[in-house]
Amino acid sequence: MTGFLGLAGFQWLLLLAALQAVLLMADAFIGHYRSGFSLRAQYAPFVSGVLLLLSAVAVSIAPGRAALTTAAVATGTLALLAGLVGAGYHHWYGITTKPGGYRWLLHHLLHHAPPLAPFALSVAGSLVVLGARGGSGADQLLGAPIRLLVLGVVTVALLGLAGQSALLHYRGAFNQPAMYIPVIVLPLAAGSIVWHLAAPSATAARGIAAALLWATFLGGFVGAGMHLRGMDRQMGGLAMGVAAVIDAPPPGAPLLVAVLGASGLVALHLL
């Protein structure tokens, strides 16, 4: 395992997971504020997210400390479960109980609770668990190498983000050619990781995976700029403040893509 800028790979992984927690909490706040926090369960991602953030930062500062590692594993597991429960809530209240139910499935997927969004909390929780265990010196978890598990989590997360992007960009009628980028690049990056895991000694597989993960990382910042531009194009633009944020493309979503790309690069090169 190698380091970068004085930090080991697992420390970087934990800090990136903490950043992911911040971004997903911001995104969740916008969505739940839009719906008026009509359910108490809508506060759950913030409780779980804050605990995850604090434990991830703490164990990244002092890796290997038993108490901090235990706390990080506990909060990571809590976040993983909270994300799964949240996905169930989004499914129940966003599809099942809506008029038309599954007969209006596409309508509900486009205009109600985003079905895959809660899984971002599960992804962050999983990465914190893996980062904490790896930072304490463990090579495996549940019988599998931690590096493989990290790359597996990143792969699944990239596919989920591609699916969610496809839904939301379809809702936006793909009015900009750049809206196709995450729908194309993220699955390619996920596929390249699978290729690398299937043929770890293949230089081409590793190089292509690295290139596509860099494209994912940099593309996330480009997407964030375009989402801000989308906010400014609303009536009244950014001067509308909260109204612009609520009704415009989610500003933090592309940054989650960048964080996942960085997490994949950390696993590829530093673990």
Where are these regions (language model features)?
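Cytosolic juxtamembrane helix and N-cap/initiation of the first transmembrane helix
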Residues: 1-17, 135-154
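Transmembrane alpha-helix entry/boundary detector in multi-pass membrane proteins
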Residues: 6-11, 30-49, 146-149, 169-185
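Hydrophobic cores of alpha-helical transmembrane segments in multi-pass inner/ER membrane proteins
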Residues: 47-58, 114-132, 184-195, 250-268
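Non-cytosolic membrane-interface motifs at loop->transmembrane helix junctions
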Residues: 36-45, 68-72, 100-111, 173-182, ...
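Juxtamembrane "helix-exit" motif on the non-cytosolic side of transmembrane helices
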Residues: 26-34, 60-63, 91-98, 163-172, ...
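C-terminal TM-helix exit segments that contain a strictly Trp-centered aromatic cap at the helix terminus
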Residues: 78-96, 215-233
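Short aromatic-rich membrane-water interface segments that cap or initiate transmembrane helices
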Residues: 3-11, 103-118, 144, 240-255
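Membrane-interface helix-loop-helix junctions at boundaries between adjacent transmembrane segments
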Residues: 67-82, 89-146
